[in-house]
Every structure is written in structure tokens, then in C-alpha cells.
Amino acid sequence: MKINFEKYPDRLAPAIVQDAATGKVLMLGYMNEEAFEKTRSENRGTFFSRSKQRLWTKGETSGNFLDVADILADCDSDAILIKARPHGAVCHMGSDTCFGETNRLGISILEKLESTIA
């Protein structure tokens, strides 16, 4: 798989992380070619921190790693989808996702049905 990092002036492609089991979007990060290759070789989500200007592996300080199940490129090969198995909270603020959503298998359908009926 080839990602078109050259499309972006900073050579950082958006990387959407999705829970491999629930399908819930967990976070958005950015990858340069080095982060992409490290993620592929180690099967752990590694990104490029725009604020720290360095690679960081999700969970390197918290222990909440993202084990990679699959990596896909979009139709233009300029965006990355990572299907992962999270170990604990994904957001640095302590929530399941960086979008403030709960990430649980199965129960979400029942919760949606309940809110629709109520």
C-alpha cells in the first residue's frame, strides 16, 4: 500500500482510527511516512505530533496502546484508516474516544433504540 504523502506540504496524511470491533471512530491523528511504516511494522498506532514535532506511539505514557488490526487507504491514497483494538481510553482526557463518545460493543444499538422510542 502506498500513501501519497507528497500531496501535503508538511507531508502529513490524516489517519482516522476506528475500533476494529465496534466500528466507532476513536480519533484523528496525522502520519508522516516514518510513522506509517512504524505502525505497519510494529502493529501499534504511531503518529506524528504536530505540537511536539516528533513521532509518538499512542499509549507510550498511558499504556493505552492501539493494536492495529488493519490499515486501509482511501480511493485517492491520501488518507489512512486504521482499524485498531484500543487498550483503555483513547483520548488523553480519559474518554473512550477523542469525540467524547462511549465505545462499547453491542450496547450502543440498544441505547439508540431506547432513545428513539422514548
Label the model's feature ranges.
Residues 2-14, 20-21, 25-26, 31-118:
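C-terminal binding/interaction regions
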